[in-house]
Structures are given as structure tokens and as C-alpha cells.
């Protein structure tokens, strides 16, 4: 099912982006 794969890929991308943003903010506050 391409729809499920597409949805999973989008969810994974969103999770990675959120995690990267959180790490970036943490590093910025740490300095």
C-alpha cells in the first residue's frame, strides 16, 4: 500500500525534524 508507506515516511520525517529542532534549541540554550 503506497498510502501507508507514504504516511509512515511523512511521520518519520516529521519526527526527525522535531527531534533535530529540539536538539538545536537545547544546544542554543546550553551555550
Swiss-Prot record:
Database matches in InterPro entries: Cyt_b6/f_cplx_su6
Top-level taxon in the UniProt lineage: Eukaryota
Keyword Transmembrane among UniProt keywords: yes
Transmembrane segments: 4-24
Pfam families, A to Z: PetL
GO biological process: photosynthesis
Listed GO MF terms: electron transporter, transferring electrons within cytochrome b6/f complex of photosystem II activity
Swiss-Prot/TrEMBL keywords: Electron transport, Membrane, Photosynthesis, Plastid, Thylakoid, Transmembrane, Transmembrane helix, Transport
Record's subcellular location: Plastid thylakoid membrane
A GO term from the CC aspect: plastid thylakoid membrane
Membrane topology according to the record: Single-pass membrane protein
Subunit structure: The 4 large subunits of the cytochrome b6-f complex are cytochrome b6, subunit IV (17 kDa polypeptide, PetD), cytochrome f and the Rieske protein, while the 4 small subunits are PetG, PetL, PetM and PetN. The complex functions as a dimer.
Family affiliation: Belongs to the PetL family.
Function: Component of the cytochrome b6-f complex, which mediates electron transfer between photosystem II (PSII) and photosystem I (PSI), cyclic electron flow around PSI, and state transitions. PetL is important for photoautotrophic growth as well as for electron transfer efficiency and stability of the cytochrome b6-f complex.
Stated name of the protein: Cytochrome b6-f complex subunit 6
Protein species of origin: Cuscuta gronovii
Organism taxonomic ancestry: Eukaryota, Viridiplantae, Streptophyta, Embryophyta, Tracheophyta
Name of the gene this protein is made from: petL
Amino acid at each position: 500500500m503506497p498510502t501507508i508507506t507514504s504516511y509512515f515516511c511523512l511521520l518519520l520525517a516529521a519526527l526527525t525534524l522535531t527531534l533535530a529542532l529540539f536538539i538545536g534549541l537545547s544546544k542554543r540554550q546550553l551555550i
